[in-house]
Structures are given as C-alpha cells and as structure tokens.
C-alpha cells in the first residue's frame, strides 16, 4: 500500500549513515527516530490500527501496533552498523522486523518477519489479521 510518509522517510534516510555521538544518541539520529515514529502513526491510520507504545533506544527503536485485541511488535535498527540506514534489506540483518505479540509488553512474541520499509505496512496489517 502507498503511504506518502513512508516514501518521504525512505527518500530522506535510506542509504544514509547518520552522526554517532557514541555515548548519547546524536541529534541527527534522534530526528530520524521522531520521523520514524510519525510515519508509524500514519501506517496505523491507514490500516485501522493504533500505535500504543514506542521506545527510542540507543540507536534503535521499537513500537507496538494494536487492532482490536491483537498486537504487532516492530523493531528497527542496524545491528552491524548502528547509524547506517538500509530500508531495502529484508534478510536476517534487516533494519526492520516485526512479529505478533500477546500485549504491548511482549518483546519475545512470534517469529521475526524481516521486511523492507515499503513492505512494513502490509506486513503489520497481515499480522494484525
């Protein structure tokens, strides 16, 4: 499905390596995290769901989507090079993965689904049933 904010985030950040302030999240990466969270809210609105919890970690982030009584956990971040953004990879080293969850505190739920940014909305929608 097409969502303008997904396209905008992709164009702005894909392939970029953001500033790394080592001991603290850089302002540039924090701006990226904020943009990712805004995009997630747009995805939720497009699939009749809501973002019920977000976490901004040290060069990674996560969130929970909810529709009815079903939850999906989404994690983003690069485990190999923490400040490099690669939205096009959907393998085990993917920047984004999602899975079913039992609640908005279930960080170990179902099987990881590695997705590209462009696949994310459809995968969340499918996992929410």
Labelled PLM ranges:
Residues 1-2, 126-129:
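Short intrinsically disordered terminal tails
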Residues 2-69, 104:
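Negatively charged, low-complexity tracts enriched in Asp/Glu with abundant Ser/Thr
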Residues 6-9, 120, 124:
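Generic structural signal of hydrophobic/aromatic residues within well-ordered alpha-helices
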Residues 55-122:
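Intrinsically disordered, low-complexity regulatory segments enriched in Ser/Thr/Pro
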């Amino acid at each position: 499905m097409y969502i303008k904010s997904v396209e905008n985030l992709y164009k702005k950040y894909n392939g970029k390596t953001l500033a790394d302030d080592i001991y603290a999240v850089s302002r540039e990466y924090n701006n990226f995290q904020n943009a990712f969270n805004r995009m997630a809210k747009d995805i939720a609105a497009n699939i009749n769901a809501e973002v019920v919890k977000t976490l901004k970690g040290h060069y990674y982030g996560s969130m929970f989507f909810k529709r009815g009584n079903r939850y999906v956990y989404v994690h983003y971040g690069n485990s190999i090079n923490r400040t490099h953004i690669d939205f096009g990879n959907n393998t085990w080293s993917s920047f984004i993965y999602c899975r079913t969850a039992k609640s908005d505190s279930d960080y170990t739920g179902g099987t990881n689904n590695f997705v590209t940014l462009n696949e994310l909305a459809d995968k969340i929608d499918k996992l929410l049933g």
